[in-house]
C-alpha cells in the first residue's frame, strides 16, 4: 500500500514568503511520512494476509478513484462486481486495511502540524492564536503588563471535556498510535545513524504489526467510569504539565515587559469535565458513580503531586552549611517525620518529606487510592490552601537566598499545578434535563402540600411558590414520605454534590446545568433542590452556579427575556451577587442545529449573545458564556480561534467555557505539544476578543437585516425537508447507519431520548454522525443554497455583490461560510448516491435524494461565488490537500459499507457482517477526522 499513485501537489506558483517555503517543505515531508507508513502497512497486509488480498486492496482503491473523480458508471459497475465477489472474511480484512491507513495518515498529519508549529516558532513567525503574537498586539495597543495582570485576575478560560460518544477508537489503539507518533517524532528531531535508522524502521514495523493484530472495536459497552478513566488519560498526556506551564510562560512574557518583582499571575486556565456528572439522558450516572468519579480525579492529581514531590526531594539536595535557609523553612523541616540520618543536614529534603507525608495522609482521609507511601506519618491537609502555604515556604526560602533559578524549576511547576488543579483535578459539572427537575419538585411539593398539583400550575404561580420556598428555612423533603426512585436518585445526586464540596472544596462541583431550560421556573426548581442539601441558603447565599442551557431555536430566542426577568427577581439576584455577580449561561449548538439547520442555528446563537450582553450590562452582572460545541460543524465545531474572535462584542469579556468532545479531545490533547498549542489558542483568542476588540463596532443594520432574511429562508428550506416532507424519517433510517451506530459500544449514553424513530427524539450526535458516514454532512450546509437564491431574487438591487461585501466585512458571516466550505469539501454526492440506493421505495428515494442533490449543487455554487473561489478549500491549501489525499482510502470504506448494510438488512444473521459495518464506521470516522 503506497501513495506513489497519488496526484502531485507541486506548487502552483513559486513561493516568496519564508512561511510559504516552510509550508511546502513540511508538506513534502508529510508525503514522505505517509508513504513510509503506507509502505509498512502494505507490507504488513501482504505478510499477514497474502499477496492476493493486497492486490485486491489496490484494485478497489484504483476503481474508487475513477468513480469519485467523475462518477464513472463503468467504475461503479466494476466496483460493485468486485465487492459482490468478496467473501465476508475478505471484506472485513479489506475494511481493516483501509481503516488503518486512515489512522496512520492522521498520525503523519499530526506530526506535520507539530513540525510546522516548531518551524514558525523558530522563525518567530506569528500566527492566529499564538499567544506571543497576541501579547505584541496588546502592547502595540497600549495595554501594559499591569493591565494584563489585572485582566487575568478575573479571567477564566476553561475547556470542558465531555463523554459525548464520537470517539470510535479504543484506548488500546490510541496507545499504539501514540507510539508510532513518538517514533516519527524522534526521526524528525534526531539525526539517526544507519543502525539507529534501521532500528527505528523495525520499531515502526513492530508497532504497525501490533496495531494490525489489535481489535479496532470494543467488545463491550463502556461504563461511565470507563469513560472517566479514558478522559483522565489526557491529563497524563497533556493537561497536568501543559496547563501550569502555559500560565507560567505567560507570566514570564509579562515579566519581560514589566516588573520582575510583580505578584504572580492568577491561574486563569481551569479544566472542566462533564464525564461522570452529565446525567441528561444517561441513567447510568448516579450519585455513587459521581462519587467514584471525584475519587478517580483526585487520585490522578494526588499521584501526580506525590511523583513530583518525590523527584523534587531528590533534586533539592541543598546542604544547610552551604546555603542559607529561611527560618520558616527550618520550622517546616523540623516538623518532618523523616528521621533518616542521610538527610539531617538537608532542610529542603526534610521539608519535602514532611509535605509528602501530609499529602499521603490527605489522600487517605479523602478515600483516594495512591501507589506511593510516605516515610512517616503526617497530619492531613485541611484544604489545598494549606498545601500551597507549605510549598510557598520552599519558594520564599529559595528566592530570599539567591536561588531563584532553582525556585523556577520543578517547584514552580508544582506550585502552579496545585493552584490550577487543587485536590479535585477538574471542575465537574452536574447536568440534568429540566423535565426531570420539574417532576422531582412536583413530587416534593405535592407531598408537602396535600391537594396541590404543581404540574397544573402556570409559570407565574410556580415562580411565586418557588421563591417563597427559597426563603423558607424549613426542609421540603420529609423523612416520613416514600418518594419515587427518580426523585430519590435526584436528591442523592445533590447530596453527593454537597459532600464533594465538604471533601474536595467548592471547585470540585461549581456548576449545576439545566438542559432544555425553557423558563424561570426551571432555574428556580434547581435552586430549591440545592437548598435542600445546603448548597443554597435561605439568606440568599449560594455555593454553586445555577446555569441555564438554551438549546432549541425557540429557547435561544427567549433566552434574553428569561434572564432579564431572572436578574430582576430579588430572591434569585441575591444568589447571583453571592457568586461575585457572575452568571453563566450555556448555549447549545447541537440541538439548535437539528431543530433549525446550520444557518439558522448559527444566526440565532449570535443574536442570543448580542441580546444577553445587553441584558447583563443593564443589570450590572458579568456574563460568562459556556459554548456547547461539538466536533463537527453540524454541532458547532470548527476552528476555536475563529469561533471566539467572531463572537459579538462583549460576549467574551475575559471569561469563556467551551466543551471539548469525543474525537476532538484526542486530536487536540493526546500529544503534549499539540495540546499546548490548542490551549494557547484558547487563551490568546479570549485575550484578543476581550481586550483588543471588546466592543467591536456592531454590524451594520442592513447586515443584520439580510442575515435575518437569509436565516428565515434557510430555516424554511431545512424544516421543509427534515420535518415536513412525508417519508423523510423512513428515508433517513434507510439511507444511513443510524441503526448500526447504536451497536458500536462507544459510549454509556443511549442514542435516543425516547424509543421512537422521530427526528425530534433523536440525539444530535447520532443525527450528525449518520450524515457524516454517508458523506452528505447535511446538518452542516442544507438550506444555504436555496436561501441565497431566493434572497437574491427578492433583492435584485443588492444581489451577489452585497453578499460578497458581507463575507469580506463581517467575521461572523465569514466564519459561517468557512465552516461550510470545509464540510462540503469532505462531502461526496457520488458516494451519497450509493447510500440512497438502500432506500427500497424508489419514488421516495428519488423525491428526497433528488432534492438533497439539487441543494448540494446550489450550496456549492453560491458558496464559491460569495467567497470568490473556483473550488472548495481554495483558501486553505493544506486542508485541501489533506482532504484530497484521504479520498482514495476513504471512499472504498463507504462502498464496502453500503454493500454490508444491504446484506445485513436482508436479514443476514452473520456476526461478521455486523462487525464489518462497525469497522467501516470506525475507518470512515478516522478518515473524516470529525464525526458527531
From Swiss-Prot:
Q: Which GO terms describe its molecular function?
A: magnesium ion binding; phosphoenolpyruvate carboxylase activity
Listed Gene3D superfamilies: Phosphoenolpyruvate/pyruvate domain (1.20.1440.90)
Cofactor(s) it depends on: Mg(2+)
Which PROSITE patterns does the record associate with it?
PEPCASE_1, PEPCASE_2
- What keywords are annotated for this sequence in UniProt? Carbon dioxide fixation, Lyase, Magnesium
| One GO location term (cellular component) | cytosol
> One biological-process term from Gene Ontology?
carbon fixation
UniProt EC number: 4.1.1.31
InterPro entries, alphabetized:
PEP_COase, PEP_COase_bac/pln-type, PEP_COase_Lys_AS, PEPCASE_His_AS, Pyrv/PenolPyrv_kinase-like_dom
**EC top class named in words:** lyase
Domain of life of the organism encoding this protein: Bacteria
Q: Which reaction does it catalyse?
A: oxaloacetate + phosphate = phosphoenolpyruvate + hydrogencarbonate
Q: Where is the active site?
A: 164, 594
Role according to the record? Forms oxaloacetate, a four-carbon dicarboxylic acid source for the tricarboxylic acid cycle.
HAMAP family found in the cross-reference section: PEPcase_type1 (MF_00595)
Please give the family membership noted in the entry: Belongs to the PEPCase type 1 family.
| Protein name stated in the entry | Phosphoenolpyruvate carboxylase
Gene source species: Bradyrhizobium diazoefficiens (strain JCM 10833 / BCRC 13528 / IAM 13628 / NBRC 14792 / USDA 110)
Q: Which gene encodes it?
A: ppc
